Amino acid sequence: CLFLTSGCRAEKPLAGGSHPPVTLSSWVVSWDRERGMEEYEKTADLWDGISLFAADFDEKGNLHFPENLENLRPKGNVPVYLTVVNDRALPGGKMVEKDREMVAEKLKTEESRYHHVKDIIRLAKEKQVDGIEVDYEKIGQDRELMNHFCDFTRMLDLEARAAHLKVRIILEPSTPMSLPYSEGPEYVVMMYNLYGTHSGPGPKADRDFIEKMLKKMVHLPGKKAAAFSTGGCLWQDSHLLGLLGGKKKYITESEAIRLAETHHAVPERDPESAALHFSYKENGSSFDVWYGDRETMNAWITLAANEGISSVSLWRLGGVDMNGLRKD
């Protein structure tokens, strides 16, 4: 269970430290496989699980596994999960990301849910993974769909157990968590993108946001995990919460470090998030960068672990220095 402390508290800067032990997992993504696997192999002893990101759907609505993830098997005995996302190809090669309508169709009836579960398990067995991770996003505000999704999690858990597969369900921060989810899977709550390309400058997570999510997670059944994001975001000419600004894009830690060095900027650490930030000017534009490093990750992990979380996932392997992460 989760233990949420309260009462008078001196708001010290958020920082890492010793904490109850946690397991750590991460994702290797299809578009950055080589760098992701290189980083995994450098830090293999850290990891208790690796997810292959991701299977999606072709234009006919059938599951599609990316070629870049074929024959990927991390060394060691670490469990490997197959992540399934609700992105769908369109004729002509374009993709619809986070396709709510497709999920609604797949989960509409008991029969359609059963067929979808069987398709996922068939792919997982074909790719010889140890578990399934479902990451269906932008569905949380549709109550009827979420009821069907809860039915789907129960059916998936039962069928996966019979197939000797583990199940993890990824939930967005805005997803309702006091719904009748199955007790079997592990529920991984995304604790990131507090600030990002949808907003003005700021950290991907901070103390208040993480504590708010921990309280919300109390309603979830079974095992609970927190997911944090490495890297950061760059904002150009940001005004009025970014609404009138220029380009905004997510960047890796290594890209942020390179920008700071190129523009002779000295990053400062924000006490409420433990994230680093700096600004610079180029070609008449001003730029703001916020990003996390291992000190940031350790601070977030420490906060979650001290509140009862025993499993943490980090998005993602590729462009980040994972050395020095603390599991206890």
Tell me what each language-model feature is.
Residues 11-116:
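Glycan-recognition patch characteristic of GH18 chitinases/ENGases
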Residues 29, 55, 59-67, 147-259:
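Substrate-binding surface in catalytic domains of secreted glycosidases
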Residues 29-45, 110-125, 172-178, 292-305:
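Short, acidic/polar
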Residues 50, 134, 187, 226, ...:
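Conserved, mostly hydrophobic/aromatic
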Residues 89-103, 230-300:
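Glycan-binding loop/region signatures in secreted carbohydrate-active enzymes
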Residues 115-147, 187-193:
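Active-site groove signature of glycoside hydrolases
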Residues 279-327:
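Extracellular low-complexity, Gly/Ser/Thr-rich intrinsically disordered linkers
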